[in-house]
Amino acid sequence: MRTIDKRIAPNVRLAATLVARAPALTLAYDARCKSRLAATLDTGEDVALVLPRGTVLRDGDVLVADDGALVRVAAAHEAVLLVRAPDALTLTRAAYHLGNRHTPVEVGAGCLKLEYDPALADMLTRLGATVERASAPFQPEAGAYGGGHRHGHDATFAEDYALAQQVFDEHHGHSHSHSHDHDHDHDHDHDHDHQHGPSCSHGHHHGHR
C-alpha cells in the first residue's frame, strides 16, 4: 500500500496536464480534516494518508505519495444545508448564530453552506432564513490568520476581532472601546478541526473566573 505523506504548497505552480493526469482522492470535509486516514483513490487503489497533524485538505490540493507520484484532492458531494434569506440582516444574523456555535461555514454570494444538521436547520428557519437540504461539495472558510478554531481568549482571535471591529467602525463611523479581562485559573483542552472564515464576523466573550 502506498503512503501519501506530503502536500505541495498552494503557491507552487505545477503543469496543468501533470495535475490532470494524477489520480483523485475524493473526500468529504470531515475526512479532509484527518491527518491519518486509510482511503481509496478514485482508481480503486487503497492508500494510507499520513500528513502532519492539523492538516486540513482543500479541494484542488496536490499530494505526493512515497513513490513520488502525485495525487489530487477533490471535495466529495455530501449532505449540506444551503441557507438564504430575504435580506442581508437576516443572513448576517444567521451567520452570527452559526459562528457562536463554532459551526464551519462556506460563504457564497447571498448564501451560506454548512454540513447537514436538523437542529441547526430548525434554528435558522426560526431566524427567518430559508433552508434547503442538498448534496454538494463543502469547503468552509479558512481562518484569516491560517488557524483553526478560535476562542475569545486566543491571541489570534483578538487580532481577528480587532480587525473586524476596525472595518465596522470605518463603515459606520463609530468608535467603540472594548475591554477584555480574562483570568484563567484552569486549563482548556480543545480539539476542533473546523475553521471559521473572516467573512463570518462574530464576537465570543469568555469570562472565566
Curated annotation (Swiss-Prot):
Signal peptide: none annotated. Keywords: Chaperone, Cytoplasm, Nickel, Nickel insertion. SMART domains: UreE_N. GO terms for molecular function: nickel cation binding; unfolded protein binding. Residues 170-196 have a biased composition (Basic and acidic residues). CDD domains: UreE. InterPro entries: UreE, UreE_C_dom, UreE_N, UreE_N_sf. One of its GO terms (biological process) is urea metabolic process. Involved in urease metallocenter assembly. Binds nickel. Probably functions as a nickel donor during metallocenter assembly. This is Urease accessory protein UreE. The gene is ureE.
